[in-house]
């Protein structure tokens, strides 16, 4: 029994769910973390209308559904919908029986204790998994980069965290969270495109703007300088073809949208930018570990995929840090999925196999076992 069964690794993000088998180098399934329910109940009898749709199917039928994201800012807020997403992951995406595989799930840093317990309970009681483990997302990203010490800037669709990690343990007191991430940048891009006269309002149109953002946006090395360049010439302008064939032109919006990561004030947020947050997290750590953190700043998550973000981060942190400090930003090309990849590495290690919470341990101790075995 020991060897041949692969563990399942599921990284539940606010925007996308990444799932697959431990030992693989990429997730098998990547789909939107959404559950859709019909807005109008079936008029046509016998149309076989389901009472809920998950992921891509919900996305494609979004015109007639009301869509909900069960994960807000990285934390699960709707457990019934979350259960539907896991069910969909096991049975429709991976096509496995969860009672036959150990399951590794990921959680946001500073996830409430009750949430970990609820997660544990659902995996064992609803899905009857033989074994379970929950791991902090940022720690997995660090593993994926081949490190055990460093600070991870993890920015996805719903939340951004800076998480200092020493020898594999997250230094909880120094973790910072900013509620600015991909979704906010998409909204901001919608707003500034409207100023140019392009109106995007519906949830369907929001997906178009997300695509524009992913294909054309970048981070300016020097924001003021870039604004001047954009004003004086058309070198920075790019065109984008909408689904209906209309072509729109986008100029300084390309770098104005992601600039919000470094200057959240444009979104009306009080928090500091990602560079200040990273710096503040490092400052909260012991003097002796700071050098190791400055030298291992690892980016992870889809919102760190903008061209130019690493160079800009290097520049901003150099200005904040002590002058003698060596600063190194690591931005691996696969960072969009590095949380999942780290989980795949961890769950397939031979030394990890004794770390799983087994069904037997769960039956003896209840959900609180998760705090004793998963750190």
Curated annotation (Swiss-Prot):
- EC number(s) reported in the record: 3.6.4.-
Stated name of the protein: Actin
Name the family. Answer: Belongs to the actin family.
A Pfam cross-reference name? Actin
What InterPro entries does UniProt report for this protein, alphabetically?
Actin, Actin/actin-like_CS, Actin_CS, ATPase_NBD
Keywords recorded for this protein, A-Z: ATP-binding, Cytoplasm, Cytoskeleton, Hydrolase, Nucleotide-binding
Compartments, as annotated in UniProt:
Cytoplasm, Cytoskeleton
| MF (Gene Ontology) | ATP binding; hydrolase activity
What GO cellular-component annotations does this UniProt entry give? Answer: cytoplasm; cytoskeleton
Task: State the protein's purpose.
Answer: Actins are highly conserved proteins that are involved in various types of cell motility and are ubiquitously expressed in all eukaryotic cells.
Reactions catalysed, as given in the entry: ATP + H2O = ADP + phosphate + H(+)
Enzyme category, top tier: hydrolase
- What is the species of this protein? Thermomyces lanuginosus
